[in-house]
Amino acid sequence: VRDAHLTTTEVGILVAAYPAGVLLAAIPSMALVDRRGVRMTTVVGIGVLIASTLGFGWGTSPLLLDASRFVQGVGGAVAWAGALAWLTSTTPSARRGSVIGGAVGAALVGMVIGPSIGALASQVGRGPVFSALAIVLVVLLLAGPSSAPAPTPRRGSVQALVKLLRSRRGAMGNGLLLVIGTVGGTMWSLVPLLVAHRMGGAGVIAAILAVSYLLAALWNVFLGRFSDRFGRLLPTLVGLAIAAALLPVIPVLSPLYVLFMVSVAAQSVISSLWTPAAALVSDGAEGSAAGQAVGVATMNAAWAAGGASGPVLAAWLADAAGFPLPFALAGGLCAASAVVVLLAYRRSGEPKAAASTAPAVERR
């Protein structure tokens, strides 16, 4: 932010650029899995990530930084679609929550390094740091497994998409991911600015991000297993209720250490909802690699739609009316979502993962 001299609104645009790229790549990634298979999709996504990481490291203008983050979102969406469809298509439905939780947890553990990289880049420069990160991605690409489910000869992505859109579980999961993207993007665009206003530096921001990611990784692993056994809605309801209570108070917290603790708690709770929400979508999708790729594509699109719009709107509201308003709206969105989940829970009972083994007609 300081290196590129970005305003509050420009920070919101930079945060939104990544999910905007994810949104753009959602449907193409689904088609790529359908035609070329999960391994080729993963390889293509990582390749795009490598190129865009170098661009972000050496870019100097706000426009180039936004473009690099946008392309990173494209690469991330493609790689995630291939990798997660690879995992879920080879896993029984009763264990998909655990598998998704492990995958999301592993990704978040990797993201713990991100704030440290950001703090290091602020000291030695973005170019060398992000070039080293690109080399790490190359190593991961070369070390990937060589075998994967072959692409299906029949192009079934359209039919799988139609079935998923008619699934109540899929609709609920994607709606929740939209909320997660909106609220998470709001926090990531505004919390660093709140820290700066309280005279906190890059180290404090990096610590908030790192601890949040680490806690969220642990929560995702736990909630994946919990949701396989007790259903997807109960942990989602509890998490939304906690977030609704914490979010409105964040901008009025004055001591920096209190802001640190509450921000970490709120962000880790929001991020932990990824697993039960994604498991709902996976339950509603077909079990084949193409069907699961469709599920991942809609997950990406739903999360990205919120993640792209939330930061920009939140930053604009913060500029126009101050920080309390966007945080209050984010808390209200979580509260409204909790009511919807509660009504679904009371209407049909907890939909356990075992129910997802029923025929697709019964799940609609």
Model-derived regions, located:
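Juxtamembrane intracellular "pre-TM" segments in multi-pass secondary transporters
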Residues: 147-174, 359-364
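Conserved MFS/SLC helix-loop-helix module at the cytosolic interface between two early adjacent transmembrane helices
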Residues: 24-60, 227-233
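Intracellular juxtamembrane helix-capping segments at the cytosolic ends
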Residues: 78-91, 272-286
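Cytoplasmic helix-loop-helix junction between adjacent transmembrane helices
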Residues: 68-107
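Residue-level signature of mid-helix packing/kink "hotspots" within the transmembrane helices
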Residues: 19-27, 111-112, 213-221, 307-308
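Helix-loop-helix hairpin linking two adjacent transmembrane segments in secondary transporters
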Residues: 102-145, 324
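C-terminal membrane-cytosol helix-exit motif in multi-pass small-molecule transporters
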Residues: 134-153, 340-345
